[in-house]
Amino acid sequence: MSNSEPTRALSDRSPGERGANQPRETAKREIEREATTTVNRGDAERTVVHFMRHGEVHNPEGILYGRLPGYRLSDRGEQQAKLVAEFLAGRDVVHVVASPLQRAQQTAEPIGATFQVDVATDERLIESENRFEGLKVSVGDGALSSPKHWPKLWNPLRPSWGEPYLQIAHRMLGAAQRARAAAAGHEAVCVSHQLPIWTLRRFLEGKPMWHDPRRRQCSLASLTSLVFRGEELVRIAYVEPAGATDPKVTGA
């Protein structure tokens, strides 16, 4: 797998330098350039798999909802999904797949409609398991301030409070390979969640999978795009068609 300079043009920026000030047309040109720099357009061996994070969720309680049922997109989240569908219009998307959770399925709907394809479901795209699910985890007034929860935090490298990073990376890599095969020579969109997408990216870039959650580059409705030549990953691109969001927002 070639991974030299996989994110140079877009992804080496800090969260404060990107997103909100990135015009949508500029972002569209950047991802177009990133997705075609290494391989020529029309190349039958070229496949792009876009990993999209779902849109904003209606979460007035501010809890970490994880895999809990019933968490739908907010009005803003629905608009974000439509913006990404418009952003991708005109590209060669032939396969759309989503996590089974409601917010991911809702995010995928306008994209499937834009390209007139049915939205498939892949369990491997689901949100990561988390032992703080259903609790508030904001700094100062959340579950993290309670001593009874501290034993869950003993190993941040695994992590001890949830699904192992390596397990997340392996299942997401499996989802990526299935999408690549389904869209061979074209493009696919996989709608998933922040931690699974970010873990996959760090795994592919050969970086440690443990990290500071405040530094994740995976905004709501963002696209992390894997460019393949055949089975070889040749580039990773990142854009925020719906603008930047704060990675510290609970349950986003």
List each language-model region with its residue ranges.
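Short glycine/proline- and acidic residue-enriched helix-loop micro-motifs
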Residues: S146-Q167
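Domain-level recognition of soluble alpha/beta enzyme cores
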Residues: K207-V234
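Generic beta-sheet signal
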Residues: V49, H186-Q194
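Acidic, His/Gly-rich catalytic cores of divalent-metal-dependent hydrolytic chemistry
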Residues: V239-A252
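Phosphate-coordination/substrate-recognition cap region in phosphate-metabolizing enzymes
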Residues: R24, T36-T38, D43-A44, L83-W150
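Short, hydrophobic/glycine-enriched beta-strand segments
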Residues: R46-H54
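Loop-to-helix element that buttresses phosphate recognition and phosphoryl-transfer chemistry
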Residues: E56-Q106, I111, W161-L173
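Glycine-rich phosphate-binding loop signature in dinucleotide/nucleotide-binding domains
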Residues: G90-D92, A179-H186
